[in-house]
Amino acid sequence: MNQSHKPPSIVVGIDGSKPAVQAALWAVDEAASRDIPLRLLYAIEPDDPGYAAHGAAARKLAAAENAVRYAFTAVEAADRPVKVEVEITQERPVTSLIRASAAAALVCVGAIGVHHFRPERVGSTAAALALSAQCPVAIVRPHRVPIGRDAAWIVVEADGSSDIGVLLGAVMAEARLRDSPVRVVTCRQSGVGDTGDDVRASLDRWLARWQPRYPDVRVQSAAVHGELLDYLAGLGRSVHMVVLSASDQEHVEQLVGAPGNAVLQEAGCTLLVVGQQYL
C-alpha cells in the first residue's frame, strides 16, 4: 500500500532491543487516546554486496519476526483496546522510519538501539529521526519512579517562537494522558537583551486559551537564568518528559547529543519533539 494512503497510526521502531519494547508499551496510551492503530515497524538493514549468501537474509528475517512477535505479545499483555499492526521492511531503519513519519501521527523509538550499549549515548537512529521526521517524535526512556500528579513534571520551554501554541497544546494533551503536572520555563542568558516580558506576555495569552480546555491539568511557570540543559539536570528524576519544538534545532541537537542524553537518561526522561503536525 502506498504510504500516503495509509490511515494515521502511532509508529514504533522495533529492533529487538528492550528499549524498543518499552517504547511500544509507552506508545499504547498514545494510540488508545487517539483511537488509531499502533504499528510495529522493523526495518531489516540491507546486506552489503556479496554478504547475502549462506542464509544471511533468512536469518535476518527470522530475527525481525521474532522481535516483532515479542513486542506484539508485550503490547497485548497491556490489555488496552488498541489495534496493533505489524510491518517489516527491507531498508535502513532511519530511512524506513522517516518514510513512515510522512503518514504517522507520532513515531516512537527507544533511546538506545540494539547496536548501542552505552546508556549515556542516544542511538543514531533516534537522533537522526528527531531532526528529520515529518511528524512528532518520541524518544522514550522508562521513568525511574512512579509517575503521579505530584511526582514528575512535563517540561516545555517557552522561547517566544511562533509555534508556542502548538507546543502548549501538545504538552497539555500529554499531561492529561500521563496524569502529570506541567512546568513551562522561560530561559534567559546573562548579558543577553531582555525580551522576557514579551515572551511571558505571549505565554500568558496562550495559556489563557489552553487551560480552560484542560482544567484538570496543573500548570506552573518558571523563569530560568541559564541553559535549559542545566535546569533539567537540576530537576533530576522529578521530570519525566521534555517537549521541544522541531524548529528549535539547537536544543533538539543538544538533548539528543551526548550531554543532553546523559541528563535525560539519568532521569529516565522521554523527549518529545513536536512540529506543526501534532494531532
Swiss-Prot record:
Q: Per its UniProt record, what InterPro entries does this chain match?
A: Rossmann-like_a/b/a_fold, Universal_stress_UspA, UspA
For this UniProt entry, what's an example GO CC term?
A: plasma membrane
What family does the entry list? Answer: Belongs to the universal stress protein A family.
- A biological process from GO: response to stress
Q: What happens when the gene is disrupted?
A: No visible phenotype under normal or hypoxic and normoxic stationary phase growth, nor in mouse- or human-derived macrophage cell lines.
* Record-annotated disulphide pairs: none
Pfam families (alphabetical): Usp (PF00582)
List where the protein spans the membrane.
Answer: none
Q: What induces it?
A: A member of the dormancy regulon. Induced in response to reduced oxygen tension (hypoxia), low levels of nitric oxide (NO) and carbon monoxide (CO). It is hoped that this regulon will give insight into the latent, or dormant phase of infection.
**Protein name listed in UniProt:** Universal stress protein Rv2028c
- Superkingdom: Bacteria
